[in-house]
Amino acid sequence: MKPTKSLFVTAALILGAMGVQAAGFVQKGNYLTVQLKQHQNYGPSQIRLQVVSDRIIRVQATAEQSFRSKQSLIIVPQNSKAKYKVEEQGDDLIITTAAMRAVLNEATGQITFYDLKDQVLLKEVAQGGKTFKPFTVPDREIGVDIAKVPEAQKHGWSWRALFDSPDNEAFYGLGQHQSEELNMKGKNEDLFQYNTKVSVPFVISNKNYGILWDSYSYSRWGNPDDYLQLNRAFKLYDKDGKEGQLTGTYVDKNGQKIVRGEDSIYFEYAMPETSEICNQTDKGGIQNLPKGFALNGSKVVYEGYVEAPTNSFYQFILYYAGYMKIYIDGKLVVPERWRTAWNPNSYKFETAIPKGKKTPIRIEWQPDGDVSYCGLRVAAPRSEAEKNQLSIWSEMSPDMDYYFIAGKNMDEVISGYRTLTGKAPVYPKWVLGFWQSRERYQSSKDIEENMKKFRDLKIPVDNIVQDWNYWKLDSWGSHEFEAVS
């Protein structure tokens, strides 16, 4: 029988900030810190658990010798007095609350969450459940203020948390992505803030738990790696079957044609002409389109064949402005989509491509503007088992930091989320009504006349939106209204 060491704890019984040293962990208030017995390459050296409440346990992990001091921008102050029980059984540190158990292996760092019926809620993979890689912010991403940024703030850690997930599990959340996806099981999503994209680092499971990770960095759900350029994932052939690249055909509005080889479709961004750092370090983006070619009114076709290294359902990401259609193996896999060039969009799709076969591909693009964007990349193939795991990756943080929230149902999980992030005020009823919005109104008179017309037609309106151009003509983005209009 394994030796068992137990310690019953109530926050009220902890004397000030005094720490309690046990065999494999240090206890201080509702924090328990473990120095791992086995330090693996790219793994954590320390793990810290915080009992936030009966249903919430915080998990921190660091690859450094100690945890950095930091203040959260997500979590409101927590003043829990939760009761919990701590036991050691062999290498396992077991924390039991009135609603759940967390088991941390002090040798490997693997953590598993159970309900009180001993049913697994969430379990890290046996190897590689927490991985770290050092990360330094590239100079070009800091920009003109690079001299003002302290050296220490340029360095952090990319981390990945990886968990097993049963086939019948579903995941919901991550924010608002216009991705036409609801259940994120087996899906990929990039988390960052954008005009039409609102990212929230929280996911809820139909198994009645949620994970909120405390990171403000670019993050990825699902596949932790960059999407690949087409020539990194497939053998490419032009429309005549010659290996090495696709055929790109550019026809301007006057019928003038340019034909050239394309080893990748990656015209996704523009470089600021005045940025010395960018122009020294980045030669990509739309500057690689044919020199002097006028996009407005043109038609562009990329075509040829791709040969896959393995049988798989390949997960693609399309970045586009203007009109776009994609055919693979003669099938329309992306029906026509359109997006204005000042606000491009991403669209994810997947399709089966067999190993070793030259599979036809055709990308049709009408740029619809003097400046426009087009990109098609693909994720490296992964097994279905890998796709079905719960995977979270964060590009740059001082440490790994997430909250496990358990509940009897999803409502209790959301209640835990609100406990951590604070109570959102209930909106007044008029906010839930009909919002009338157009690109812009240029004067108060404009707004009042339109509002009167709605009333005359007896069309109910609760809100009318003044979007942009409320400022003076030469004061773009100002928070001061133009007084005359």
Predicted segments, located by residue:
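Aromatic-lined carbohydrate-binding/catalytic grooves of carbohydrate-active enzymes
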Residues: V333-W338, W342-P344, K423-S485
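A low-complexity, Ser/Thr/Gly/Pro-enriched, surface-exposed linker/loop concept
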Residues: F25, G29, R48-L93, K133
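Catalytic and substrate-binding clefts that recognize carbohydrates or anionic sugar/phosphate headgroups
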Residues: E88-G241, G255, Y314-L318, Y323, ...
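Bacterial Sec-dependent N-terminal signal peptides
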Residues: M1-G24
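Non-cytosolic beta-sheet module surface loops
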Residues: Q38-Q40, V51, A63, V306-A308, ...
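Extracellular and analogous surface-interaction loops
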Residues: V51, I204, F293-N296, V301-Y314, ...
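Extended carbohydrate-recognition surfaces in non-catalytic/accessory domains of CAZymes
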Residues: N231-T310, D399-V426
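Solvent-exposed beta-strand/loop surfaces of large extracellular or lumenal domains
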Residues: S69-K85, I328-F349
